[in-house]
């Protein structure tokens, strides 16, 4: 089954907690600090794989979770970091944040990686908190939570050439003639329900990939027929072969069909109509097709038309040669364009923008809540089981301006203040 869209949940692992431990050493208070750091939590990574053609693997399993990092140990030993979870996806997969719609990355090259949920950092142990005046610190950090994200995966077929047109204009037949692909072919509309891919190899050694896309009809860009779910596959093609039937018995106006498809491409995105296009008049082996072709050319004006018959192979070689020329031309133009965004071929890590701000809100007569990404992470990473940890957090909150902000909102001694899942009394 061809699956080109899916939704998945990814949960990275939590970082391990730092340890509070002490050495047994003569004349050193409590033996000296010896608590090791926690290990990093596992990340979730998508990897482009040239051997896959569909998102079928995600149809029945849609939740993925990486392991947590190990906690720090005694004797200054670090906890082990968790293994990353690597999920293989087809080349051509676009990854979106499901909730915001933001494009996180495009996986278009074999082996390219995208980190979609980062594992939490491990907390540091008490060996890092020793000072000349605090020789036996009972402070360690908790590990950071791993990121959670809901993703929308969308596969856009990677092909140099896309075949577009109304149903039953001969797209699948042409693909079967010029490649080794074996698409389903029948004399009824919408025989092709999923994109078919094939490789065209010319006698001169040139080659290019070709995709036969399901037939479009009027209103496709708004979801009519197979519609918009397949229009996106045209986006990555370099060249469009626009097939128009010259069968005089189908009761259709060739020029109107051509204009309708062009309108639907533009309705999806203007970028599609700016692609290189070859107009292909198909089914030229049918009696009466020459007259229909002449009328079609007259209405088109000065645009070039390539008449072919996939049955007799009339004009097919010339069409493939011209197509190869255009593919090379577009590839050269793309290579000469300055890259707008540089993306590493091997690994592209999506990172959330850092938010240093915070907000104070009154939730009751004597209660307040303070929110902010950086602030909440600070609280989550502080080990609140030890007095030293609580005192350190209080000093950091004061330096960040939280105390002053609470006073401005009217906080007084004894009021409750909540940050993340931690609640404490305000002391002025």
UniProtKB/Swiss-Prot annotation:
Report the SS bond pairs.
none
Alphabetically sorted, this entry's keywords are: Cytoplasm, GTP-binding, Hydrolase, Magnesium, Metal-binding, Nucleotide-binding
What processes does the entry annotate via GO biological process terms? Answer: ribosome biogenesis
Question: Which residues are involved in binding GTP?
Answer: 165-172, 190-194, 212-215, 282-285, 309-311
Residue ranges annotated for the OBG-type G domain, each copy included: 159-328
List the Gene3D superfamilies: GTP-binding protein OBG, C-terminal domain (3.30.300.350), GTP1/OBG domain (2.70.210.12), P-loop containing nucleotide triphosphate hydrolases (3.40.50.300)
> Which SUPFAM superfamilies does the UniProt entry name for this protein?
Obg GTP-binding protein C-terminal domain (SSF102741), Obg GTP-binding protein N-terminal domain (SSF82051), P-loop containing nucleoside triphosphate hydrolases (SSF52540)
Please name the InterPro entries in this protein's record: G_OBG (IPR031167), GTP-bd (IPR006073), GTP-bd_Obg/CgtA (IPR014100), GTP-bd_prot_GTP1/OBG_C_sf (IPR036346), GTP1-OBG_CS (IPR006074), GTP1_OBG_dom (IPR006169), GTP1_OBG_dom_sf (IPR036726), OBG_GTPase (IPR045086)
Subcellular locations according to the entry:
Cytoplasm
Family from the record: Belongs to the TRAFAC class OBG-HflX-like GTPase superfamily. OBG GTPase family.
In UniProt terms, what function does this protein have? An essential GTPase which binds GTP, GDP and possibly (p)ppGpp with moderate affinity, with high nucleotide exchange rates and a fairly low GTP hydrolysis rate. Plays a role in control of the cell cycle, stress response, ribosome biogenesis and in those bacteria that undergo differentiation, in morphogenesis control.
Q: How does it assemble?
A: Monomer.
Q: What is this protein called?
A: GTPase Obg
- Taxon lineage: Bacteria, Bacillati, Bacillota, Bacilli, Lactobacillales
